[in-house]
Amino acid sequence: MILIWFVKLIEKTVCKIIPQREQDEEYRLRFITGGMLSTAELSILQARKEINLFAERTHRMFGMVRDLLHTTNDNDFNKLFSRIEKYENISDNMEVEIANYLNQVSDGRLSSESKLQIRAMLREVTEIESIGDSCYNLARTINRKHRSDMDFTPKQYDHIHQMFQLTDDALSQMVSLVEDEHHVVDVNKSFNIENEINNYRNQLKNQNVLDVNNKEYDYQMGVHYMDIIGECEKLGDYVVNVVEASSNVKEKKS
């Protein structure tokens, strides 16, 4: 039990022994590649860092989706789409590897608090991977639109940009919260952004029916458009699930 008080000190020592690699696009695990550590608490801390990195990289993946929307050159588009596809595949692997590590930790002797932590962290990992899936779904919709001979109207682009900004705000807030060790990040901000996303989706859904009927754009472009808007709303739901899992365990710890 004495070791618990020195977890932070041991953690710093381990980080010096196992230096962090430079960020790359391989989505390689950084903190739990060496197997289980001397205590369950220290192993959980390392898994926490891996989840934080997973969240950051998924946020970066969404940034690629935003870039893809305005990439017109076919060669550049294909390269960026392939990069997003690669991120999605490795995101799947990260979910499995982190979950397997946490399940190994849970096989040991754990306090009730540690068991709650692991349960919440497993939920976080699942939902972060779902965010990666949503990013890939967005990229696939943009790809279908890119392969067609049609384009969104300026008004549609404006609405997509606004929805993308709300989604990016949600992801930024999520990353800040999962990395927050001192409970200073306001959880309610995430819920407020989610409400904004839901309300905006409903507004655009109703407006889309009117715009298609008024022949401002054809039905198929309306489908691509609403697929993007709807997927952003789903992504926002996954973000809130991560936030809830992370904030619940931190409340129990404090």
Residue map of PLM features:
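Cytosolic, long alpha-helical scaffolding segments
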Residues: M1-S254
